[in-house]
Amino acid sequence: MWVSSPDPSDIQARVKALTEARGVPMLGENDVPPLLADAVVATEDERFYSHHGIDSIGLSRALLYDVTNLCLCQGGSTITAQLAKDVYLGGSDRGYNKVKDMALALKIERVLTKRQILADYLSEITTGYGHYGVTEAACVYFHAPLGSLTLGQYALLAGVTQAPSIYDPTVNPDAARQRRSQVLAQMVAEHYITAAQRDKANAEPVVAAGPGC
């Protein structure tokens, strides 16, 4: 079913309903720690602050890869498109819905700030086995408030969100450490942190406290 044009109250109400149903907090645009925002943008959507919902460069690159490899391997999706897919389309990855989530992403970008889009996305994403949102992830993995984590912990969270079943530090600490290193390297490449900060964060142990807060 096609979705009508979203407006701020519509999408905010939907995200609120999702987070309330899952028992996790909904982040406001000022609640996302800057280092976490930098880590997520650097690794998931490097042109997030310059595109309008669709990253034409990333989409073209993904299309070329898929055509060359005869597969639907790369989606070229943006953070905004992912939010649209999760909130309006139930997270479906079917090709038919990719057109819808891109169209919705363009509309969402007209009515929400970049900071609120990122906050909504980080409020509702899957972050582990039955866990949702980065606030719960910080509690589950580190037994700490979201705003009090280290650079290494933020990088680990950013890595977990892309593939929770693979990078969950309570299940695969070695994979989580490797992914954290990749996130930190990308943050250096995008000029969010220095090489010295990267090295210090890479030296942090991957300490996962396990389920419960």
Model-inferred region functions:
Residues 1-213:
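Juxtamembrane regions of bacterial inner-membrane/periplasmic proteins
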